[in-house]
């Protein structure tokens, strides 16, 4: 069992979205489904066959967005935090749901959560999960 892992998912961060409906059938939006599959893939690689973590865990999610091309160089240098959509809690929900049973047994184990959204030189989500079992 790993006590701490980190991994990065390249590409534009995606947030958890409410399931869509088509008549009587409900479906997961395609963008969300493909992003969840990518998160699962990178999490599985990071775990390298280790058993999921037991007990309380701390999860850190850093969502980095590429600044819009329409922004001037000055604005790109001045603006760091991303305050528009997607919501930070929905990004964390998508990640925790995707890594459920891969990194930890159940996402209810997440006892401490930190999520940041900001602009950077590439679009990526960086995820770190650490067991709090021994140290608190």
Label every PLM stretch briefly:
Residues 1-136:
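Acidic, proline/glycine-enriched N-terminal capping motif
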């Amino acid at each position: 069992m790993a006590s701490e892992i980190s991994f990065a998912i390249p590409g534009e961060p995606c947030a958890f979205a409410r399931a869509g409906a088509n008549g009587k059938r409900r479906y997961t939006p395609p963008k969300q489904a493909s992003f969840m599959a990518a998160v699962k893939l990178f999490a599985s690689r990071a775990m390298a066959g280790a058993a999921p973590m037991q007990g309380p865990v701390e999860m850190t999610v850093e969502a980095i967005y590429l600044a819009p091309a329409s922004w001037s160089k000055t604005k790109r240098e001045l603006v760091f935090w991303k305050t528009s959509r997607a919501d930070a809690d929905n990004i964390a929900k998508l990640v925790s749901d995707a890594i459920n049973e891969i990194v930890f047994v159940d996402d209810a184990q997440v006892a401490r959560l930190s999520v940041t959204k900001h602009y950077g030189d590439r679009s990526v989500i960086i995820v770190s999960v650490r067991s709090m079992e021994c140290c608190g």
